[in-house]
C-alpha cells in the first residue's frame, strides 16, 4: 500500500488447515507395509476366509511384511488422525529517504504451527476355514495395541531491517550498498503420551496406567546477523563487490557465538573495451567476461553434527531418566524394593567448539560466439571446509574416569575442480530452441589435524 510518494507498507496473511485420516497401521513403516502388500499378494490369497466378510483370512506374512490388506481398515485396525494448523503474518515497510538512492526497509514475520495427532491401533483375529468341520479357527491374533496422543507447537519470529543505497553518478559510475540487521527465533514444544498395550479398547482415551509413556521436549533456537554489502561498476565493464556477515548462533558458548564471514567478487567485461570492439577477434567472439570471487560462510552445525554436539553441550549438568535400578526405599528398614530412575553425568562440557567455516574460491570466464548464439562458461573452483569437529587423538583420559575427550574444530576437507558448460541458443521463425552440455571434474581431499595443547 502506497501511503505517500516516499512511504509504502504491506501486510500478508497465510494460513492452512489440514486433516489426514488413515487406518492406524501397525509397525514403524506403515505405508511401506501397505505397498509391499499391493505388489506381493497374489489373487489366490483371498481377503476373507471362505469368502465370508465376517472372518479375515490368515495370510502367512512374506519376508517383506506383506499382510492381508482387508485388515487395514479404520473399523478393523483403528484410526490415525493428524490435524495440522498454521498461520503466518508478515508486515513490511519501505521508506525513501531525502537522500537520492537511499531506502530504508523493514520486514517482520510471525509464524505459528500446531499439530495434534492421535493413533488408536486395535487388535484383531485372522482365521482359517476348515471345510471338514465348517468351522472358522483363529490362526493369528494381532495383540500389540497402541494408543498415542502427540501435540506439537512451534512459534517463529523473524525480522530484517536494512538500509539500501543505489545510485548512478555521472551516467557511468554505479554504486550500491546494503547494511542491516536480521534475527530469527524459534520456540518448539513437543509432547507425546502413549499407552501400549491399551487398557480399555472401547474408550478412545488414554487412562492412567503403568503402561503409559510420556515424552516431552522443549527447544529454543536463536540467531542474529549484521550484514553489509558494497558494490561498484564503471560502465558495467569493471565490476567489484564486497560483502560480509557477522553471525551469532545459540549453539555455542558465549564468547564463541559470533563469527565474521567476508566475501569479494570482481568481473571485467573485456568485450566492452573499445580496443576489443575494433579488433578482428570481435568478429567471431562476440563477448568475453572474466570473473573471480572468494567468499566465506559459517555453519553452526545445527544439523550436520547435532548427534555429537547436542543443544547446550557447553553447559555442565546431568541427564535424567538415564538407566535405573531396583533398590530398597529404606535400606535400614524392611521397605519393599522399587525401581528408581537413574541420572547420569553429561560429561565434560563442550566449550571448545565454534563456527565451522566454508570458504569458496572461483575463477572463470564466459565467452559468446556468433552473436552469443553459442556460449561457453568455464569455472575453476575450490571449496574448503575448516573447523570440522573431531576428537583429538593425543589427549587421553584414564578409562576409570568415565570421561570423553572434548571435540575441537580440528579437521578440514577440500573439493576442487572444473565446471564447464556449452550452450547453443537460436531461433527459427517463431520457434526457439537451445542445447546445453555440462561437464565437471572434481577432486576431494581430507586433512586431519592433531589438537594443540
List PLM regions with ranges.
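Intrinsically disordered, compositionally biased low-complexity regions
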Residues: 128-130
Amino acid at each position: 500500500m502506497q501511503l505517500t510518494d516516499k512511504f509504502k507498507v504491506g501486510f500478508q496473511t497465510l494460513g492452512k488447515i489440514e486433516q489426514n485420516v488413515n487406518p492406524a497401521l501397525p509397525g514403524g513403516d506403515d505405508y511401506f507395509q501397505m505397498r509391499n502388500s499391493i505388489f506381493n499378494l497374489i489373487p489366490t490369497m483371498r481377503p476373507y476366509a471362505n469368502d465370508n466378510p465376517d472372518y479375515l483370512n490368515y495370510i502367512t506374512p512374506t519376508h517383506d511384511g506383506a499382510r492381508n490388506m482387508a485388515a487395514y481398515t479404520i473399523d478393523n485396525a483403528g484410526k490415525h488422525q493428524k490435524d495440522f494448523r498454521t498461520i503466518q503474518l508478515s508486515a513490511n515497510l519501505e521508506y525513501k529517504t531525502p537522500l537520492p538512492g537511499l531506502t530504508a526497509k523493514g520486514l517482520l514475520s510471525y509464524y505459528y504451527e500446531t499439530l495434534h495427532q492421535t493413533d488408536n491401533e486395535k487388535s484383531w483375529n485372522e482365521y482359517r476355514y476348515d471345510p471338514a468341520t465348517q468351522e472358522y479357527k483363529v490362526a493369528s491374533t494381532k495383540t500389540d495395541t497402541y494408543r498415542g496422543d502427540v501435540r506439537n507447537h512451534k512459534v517463529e519470529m523473524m525480522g530484517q531491517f536494512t538500509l539500501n543505497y543505489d545510485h548512478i553518478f555521472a551516467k557511468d559510475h554505479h554504486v550500491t550498498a546494503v547494511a542491516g540487521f536480521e534475527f530469527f527465533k524459534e520456540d518448539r514444544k513437543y509432547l507425546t503420551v502413549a499407552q501400549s498395550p491399551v487398557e480399555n479398547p472401547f474408550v478412545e482415551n488414554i487412562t492412567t496406567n503403568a503402561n503409559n509413556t510420556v515424552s516431552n521436549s522443549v527447544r529454543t533456537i536463536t540467531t542474529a546477523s549484521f550484514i553489509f554489502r558494497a558494490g561498484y561498476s564503471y560502465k558495467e565493464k569493471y565490476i567489484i563487490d564486497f560483502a560480509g556477515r557477522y553471525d551469532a548462533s545459540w549453539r555455542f558458548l558465549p564468547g564463541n557465538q559470533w563469527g565474521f564471514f567476508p566475501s569479494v567478487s570482481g568481473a571485467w567485461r573485456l568485450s566492452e573495451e573499445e580496443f576489443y570492439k575494433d579488433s578482428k577477434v570481435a568478429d567471431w567472439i562476440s563477448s568475453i567476461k572474466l570473473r573471480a570471487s572468494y567468499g566465506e560462510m559459517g555453519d553452526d552445525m545445527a544439523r550436520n553434527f547435532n548427534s555429537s554436539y547436542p543443544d547446550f553441550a557447553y553447559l555442565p549438568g546431568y541427564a535424567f531418566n538415564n538407566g535405573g535400578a531396583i533398590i530398597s526405599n529404606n535400606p535400614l528398614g524392611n521397605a519393599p524394593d522399587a525401581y528408581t530412575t537413574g541420572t547420569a553425568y553429561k560429561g565434560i562440557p563442550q566449550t571448545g567448539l565454534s563456527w565451522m567455516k566454508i570458504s569458496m574460491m572461483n575463477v572463470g570466464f564466459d565467452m559468446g560466439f556468433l552473436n552469443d548464439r553459442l556460449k561457453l562458461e568455464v569455472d575453476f573452483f575450490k571449496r574448503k571446509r575448516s573447523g570440522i569437529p573431531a576428537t583429538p587423538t593425543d589427549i587421553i583420559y584414564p578409562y576409570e574416569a568415565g570421561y570423553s575427550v572434548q571435540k575441537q574444530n580440528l579437521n578440514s576437507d577440500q573439493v576442487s575442480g572444473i565446471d564447464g558448460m556449452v550452450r547453443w541458443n537460436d531461433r527459427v521463425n517463431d520457434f526457439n530452441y537451445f542445447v546445453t552440455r555440462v561437464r565437471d571434474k572434481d577432486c576431494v581431499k581430507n586433512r586431519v589435524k592433531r589438537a594443540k595443547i
